């Protein structure tokens, strides 16, 4: 794994190199500014598998750098781990919204960094496997292809509040029990997602799910929120307040917005997504519900609602 680390503190970069070498990651390049990083990333002779970005840098911050990195075709889905010494978590949501996959605290803990980079390595291998399948199909048939599995999350980028599912889980984990108590979680389900999946190719399916995400994003515009596709046409939204939204009103708004796509879907021969809204969930102050359990509960909730709708 080739890693690019960006931090304005040369002493920290030396310490980071020591930690990474100790845990087996020796292919490291370091630079001290966002501008230097962008020059390297735009160089076709350079290729990095993972980026470690300090958030609090003068000039171009790590969050702004992450946003610019995501605009580069070669790095639109490269794993990005943010690094910070800041105690406040106010930066966390903007970082994930800009495209970060995870984050670690300074001073760097060797075990934490090993765990984070192991997850990054798994992500890289999965993406390489998919890219290999797509490349073989494209070569054999002369057509562009995106390999999508129905059960798995797909990366969507059409709406400003949409992030990867793993990134949403990582964001929720950063909140801790007390901050998570102040959030709400809500599930959405495209009940005919399997029919849509079978009626089009990977590109068409992703485009359709992106349209659904955009509609959900618009319906939640009154709340600060993040959304992720979770697989099987299901979405999870995190709202940064304990809210009691009128889900019936939300359902009506989504139905109306989806109807605007009816002519397009009829022309394409793809079923119009039928979106169901689940129940709003909160964690209890004294409960220790895990993030994964909370998200699973949100998905099960919307499945239950869809069964009787």
Please annotate each region the language model reported.
Residues 1-20, 51:
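Conserved acidic segment of CheY-like receiver
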Residues 57, 69:
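Receiver (REC) domain active-site loop signature in two-component systems and cognate sites
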Residues 122-176:
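CheY-like receiver
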Residues 154-173, 179-184, 191-217, 228-232, ...:
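Conserved long alpha-helical elements within nucleotide-processing catalytic cores of c-di-GMP signaling
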